[in-house]
Amino acid sequence: MTKVKKEECEEVPETPSKSYDELLSYLNPVAKPLAGRKLTKKLYKCVKKAIKQKNIRRGVKEVQKFINKGEKGIVVMAGDTLPIEVYCHIPVMCEDRGIPYSYVPSKSDLGAAAGSKRPTCVILIKPHEDYQEAYDECLEDVQALPLPY
């Protein structure tokens, strides 16, 4: 075994991130209400701000546990999660407790916004005074989305 010099190694090009329209082709039939392009961007920014304050719940088990305990916030779910049975009960729980929820197109982008290398399918953003303005803006926009009846 020999060492390979740096000059000889080919650089692996970064995979370009897919556009919003490309991500829409991978959606589940359950992913409604889906956040638009601008709202998706706002939600990702709000998640990034919430991560800095450690004011976030990540993952199906953790989000489900804290929704049952009565914690309030905005639930953001990835629309490309398969199988659907993993998280199809979360919207019903949110509606029963009056918690606004929305879907975004990509679980890998949601995980990246949460500062994780792993994809994340459900996130609960809790309110905090440091990013209250961004949170209120997202809350207003998510509540304005039509419910899928």
Swiss-Prot record:
Keywords: Nucleus, Ribonucleoprotein, Ribosome biogenesis, RNA-binding, rRNA processing. It comes from Xenopus laevis (African clawed frog). It is found in: Nucleus, Nucleolus. Component of the small nucleolar ribonucleoprotein particle containing H/ACA-type snoRNAs (H/ACA snoRNPs). Component of the telomerase holoenzyme complex. Belongs to the eukaryotic ribosomal protein eL8 family. GO terms for molecular function: box H/ACA snoRNA binding. Transmembrane segments: none annotated. The keyword Nucleotidyltransferase does not apply. This is H/ACA ribonucleoprotein complex subunit 2-like protein. It holds the Pfam family Ribosomal_L7Ae. InterPro entries: eL8/uL1-like (IPR050257), H/ACA_rnp_Nhp2-like (IPR002415), Ribosomal_eL30-like_sf (IPR029064), Ribosomal_eL8-like_CS (IPR004037), Ribosomal_eL8/eL30/eS12/Gad45 (IPR004038), Ribosomal_eL8/Nhp2 (IPR018492). Its main location: nucleus. Disulfide bonds: none annotated. GO terms for cellular component: box H/ACA snoRNP complex; sno(s)RNA-containing ribonucleoprotein complex; telomerase holoenzyme complex. One of its GO terms (biological process) is snRNA pseudouridine synthesis. The gene is nhp2. Required for ribosome biogenesis. Part of a complex which catalyzes pseudouridylation of rRNA. This involves the isomerization of uridine such that the ribose is subsequently attached to C5, instead of the normal N1. Pseudouridine ('psi') residues may serve to stabilize the conformation of rRNAs.
